[in-house]
Amino acid sequence: YLSGEAFAALRGHTILGRTMREGPNDTAAFDRGLARAADPGHLLHHLFGVRALALFGALGEAEGASYLSGLLIGHEVRAACAGDGASVHLIGAETLCGLYARAIAARGAQAVVHGEEAAARGLFRLSAEVNWQ
């Protein structure tokens, strides 16, 4: 998925970004985005709604980026996660894994966070088992 790249492009190079300002993650706004992603409808329709919410004052400048993040991550998780209670393993930065874990939990699955060092540990174990010549 290209959720991070889509977020950066939408935030930095579209009219949506003009309604947002930099700031810390707003958990309530992120959760609103997650909830909207769970509603019927497609991503483009929901993205149009971000602009409408901002224009009508229902989404403040400080909340916009977190809402957009929740919307994009929510759509990604909705597409990838069946919500059948299965575990989803996450590898990455703690903050980003936390957001994904929140979205996965909202879909009824369990996130297992391994952290940033998991890839390096896996490569090390693989190198120990493979005879490199």
Locate each region found by the language model.
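Adenine-nucleotide phosphate-binding core of ATP-dependent small-molecule kinases
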Residues: 36-79
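Short hydrophobic/aromatic-enriched beta-strand-loop microsegments
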Residues: 1, 101, 107-117
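Flexible, glycine/charged-enriched surface loops at secondary-structure junctions
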Residues: 63, 87, 111-114
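Conserved active-site and cofactor/substrate-binding residues in soluble primary-metabolism enzymes
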Residues: 1, 5, 42, 64-75, ...
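Glycine-rich phosphate-binding loop plus the immediately following alpha-helix
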Residues: 1-36
